[in-house]
Design a protein with these regions (language model features):
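Terminal "cap-and-tail" regions of soluble proteins that handle hydrophobic small molecules
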Residues: 2-8, 103-175
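Glycine-centered tight beta-turn/hairpin loop motif at sheet-sheet or coil-to-beta transitions
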Residues: 12, 67-69, 90-92
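A short, structured loop/turn motif at beta-sheet edges
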Residues: 25-26, 77-82, 99-107
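Hydrophobic/aromatic beta-strand elements that line small-molecule binding cavities or substrate pockets
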Residues: 19, 72-78, 94-101
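Hydrophobic ligand-binding cavity/cleft-lining segments
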Residues: 1-45, 169-175
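Short beta-edge strand/loop motif at the mouth of beta-sheet-based domains
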Residues: 16-17, 35-71, 82-84, 141-152
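Hydrophobic pocket/interface hotspot
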Residues: 28, 38, 59, 76, ...
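Residue-level recognition of conserved beta-strand positions in structured domain cores
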Residues: 42, 63, 89, 99, ...
């Protein structure tokens, strides 16, 4: 069963993932906003201008050079601690994190509004990232299996899916 769903009702498709986390929203907020905590699960470093998640703040996303030589930039679109964080991710994507109290924990909803051909790739990647955030083990070939499942699910609705860039050096390298 796939974890991510595809929403095609907006101006661009979006992949949406939900995860139940055992910690309260204030703790999860720190995990999605504090640089040292992001390093444990996010796919790259996250540097926020001035160190504060405020609307309009610039963000830099340098990837580890051993994975891919690339740096994305972004801008904070919304920040309502500990409920909502949204920002641009490069030139073509918008990430949105919604935190909902659920019992003693939090329901985290991650939406990635993106280019249609990137939906399966990003769904597989975000699922792996959220597994890390939740403290779950990640198998070495999990990304490829998830990508194949999401490609089969998404292609009939939004067309062919692209794997990672050719210059990607990580485990999920393209065929």
């Amino acid at each position: 069963m796939t974890d991510a769903t595809l929403d095609t009702t907006g101006p661009k498709p979006a992949v949406r993932l939900e995860r139940r986390l055992p910690d309260p929203p204030a703790v999860v907020w720190r995990a999605i906003t504090e640089r040292d905590q992001l390093k444990a699960w996010f796919p790259c470093d996250v540097i926020v201008e001035g160190g504060r998640w405020e609307v309009g703040a610039a963000i830099t996303f340098p990837f580890p050079p051993e994975v891919i030589e690339m740096t994305l930039t972004g801008t904070v679109l919304a920040a309502d601690e500990p409920k909502l964080l949204s920002y641009t991710w490069g030139e073509e994507e918008i990430l949105r994190f919604e935190l909902y109290p659920e019992g003693d924990g939090t329901r985290l909803v991650l939406s990635d509004q993106l280019r249609a051909g990137w939906a399966a790739r990003n769904a597989a990647g975000w699922e792996e990232c959220l597994d890390r955030l939740a403290g779950l083990p990640v198998e070495p070939d999990a990304w490829r299996r998830r990508f194949d499942v999401y490609s089969a699910a998404f292609e009939p609705r939004i067309g062919p899916q692209q794997g990672p860039p050719a210059e990607y050096k990580g485990e999920a390298s393209a065929d």
